[in-house]
Amino acid sequence: MVEWANITWIMLHTFTVKIKENIIITHNNEIKDFLYLVINNLPCSICRNKSKKYFNDNIKTIIDKKTLILFLYNFHNFVNLILSKKQFDYHLLDRYYLTKTEEIFSIFNKLNQYPDEIKDFLIDNIIWFND
């Protein structure tokens, strides 16, 4: 897998499992906007275009932490299906509870060429996450 893809998945799964429950409720639209921004800037055009449709078709399912985690898990497997890759096992999500959020976000920001808006969101909202 391409380097940007690995760290992007790590960042996104860390994001979903480490975010505080109350943040999803109080900042639901901001979280959805952030996820859309990441998807809209995926370097892989095939992934980006199909992902935007998936996002638009399924984004309303995110109402709490559980549904956010499930949305991203299903989205990851949707992308893997497009790329003819092995499905991502749900139990692998457990490892993201052990990550250090700020460290993952920092690595993501250094390794990617995403717009500053994405990087700034992660830095500015680090207090939204448990560690």
Locate the predicted segments by residue.
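Aromatic-rich, lipid-facing transmembrane alpha helices and their immediate juxtamembrane interface loops
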Residues: 1-131
